[in-house]
């Protein structure tokens, strides 16, 4: 790894993080505001099906996979700078765990504590052969996905992220667009087949009475096929980012992803504060939750873009970095 590679930020990962965050909030807002189940055959019921088919478990999977990629890049770059990447990573996930402990008091379904714990589990795999990480991650994911529990899929997804980092897949996207196109096409076919199968098991009504078993089966199928759909989403985004016009149009998404920690935690703050002030708890419908998320998108995308014009790090990213390296990096950008 040369000096340029050590200091160069991989933009595509920021785009993907921002993309994942935009999907995650659509799901997280439901339990946070106790959104009521919709009446069958309404627009709210249709939106709920849309969430379970195209969002639930898809963007969380992307975010988890990207944690594995970031894990490999972080340690590699730290080692290349002559620092102890393992020690720095342990500090990094300890700080992440602390953030998670605070966050879980307000959002019981939060992911940071899980990521920190699983970060310890994947640490020995940093030096494993990339083929081993790829094969082991795929086999684990295939087997554990049959249990339809998102928690079981975290470690294998992170291992696949490590393998992607070892293969340097995100550092040469313009050179690999043909391979990416074939991969994305294959994932599209599998995704369509899986989604059709899941849709065929969609319940008439969700979550009550005799329909609860059907609902659970519908959800289990969705979680099982989630990694396939997520792989298609990632491949499609990478293909689109090969076009400069797309990169320009989606540039706010890159800023959003660069401040992923700040935006992830502030999503919860915005939802809970607005829920309290506007009395939304148990009074908001599924479609209204979508409109609320759209408003949060505008706020956070705008804030992220403006903030990063003047500062090098997001607010919580700066705290995270400071506590990881035990030094205070300059926050404000230097003007030339």
Predicted segment positions?
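Alpha-helical transmembrane segments and their immediate juxtamembrane cytosolic regions
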Residues: 1-336
């Amino acid at each position: 790894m040369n000096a340029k590679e050590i200091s160069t930020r991989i933009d595509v990962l920021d785009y993907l993080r921002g993309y994942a965050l935009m999907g995650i909030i659509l799901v997280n807002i439901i339990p946070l505001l106790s959104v009521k189940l919709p009446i069958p055959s309404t627009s709210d019921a249709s939106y709920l099906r849309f969430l379970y088919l195209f969002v639930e478990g898809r963007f969380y999977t992307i975010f988890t996979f990207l944690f594995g990629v970031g894990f490999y890049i972080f340690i590699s770059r730290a080692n290349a700078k002559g620092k102890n990447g393992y020690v720095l990573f342990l500090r990094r996930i300890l700080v992440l765990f602390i953030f998670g402990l605070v966050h879980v008091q307000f959002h019981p379904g939060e992911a940071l504590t899980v990521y920190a714990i699983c970060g310890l589990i994947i640490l020995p795999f940093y030096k494993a052969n990339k083929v081993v990480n790829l094969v082991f991650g795929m086999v684990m994911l295939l087997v554990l996905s049959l249990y339809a529990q998102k928690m079981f899929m975290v470690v294998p997804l992170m291992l696949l992220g490590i393998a992607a980092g070892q293969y340097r897949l995100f550092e040469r996207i313009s050179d690999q667009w043909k391979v990416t196109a074939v991969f994305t096409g294959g994932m599209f076919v599998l995704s369509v087949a899986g989604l059709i199968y899941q849709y065929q098991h969609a319940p008439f009504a969700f979550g009550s009475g005799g329909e609860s078993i059907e609902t659970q089966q519908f959800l289990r199928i969705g979680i099982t096929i989630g990694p396939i759909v997520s792989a298609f989403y990632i491949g499609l985004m990478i293909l689109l980012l090969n076009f400069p016009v797309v990169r320009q149009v989606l540039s706010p998404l890159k800023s959003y992803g660069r401040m992923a920690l700040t935006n992830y935690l502030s999503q919860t703050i915005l939802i809970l504060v607005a829920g309290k002030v506007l009395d939304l708890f148990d009074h908001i419908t599924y479609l209204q939750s979508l409109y609320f998320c759209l408003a949060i998108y505008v706020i956070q995308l705008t804030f992220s873009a403006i903030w990063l014009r003047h500062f090098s790090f997001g607010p919580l990213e700066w705290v995270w970095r400071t506590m990881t390296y035990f030094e205070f990096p300059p926050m404000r950008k230097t003007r030339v």
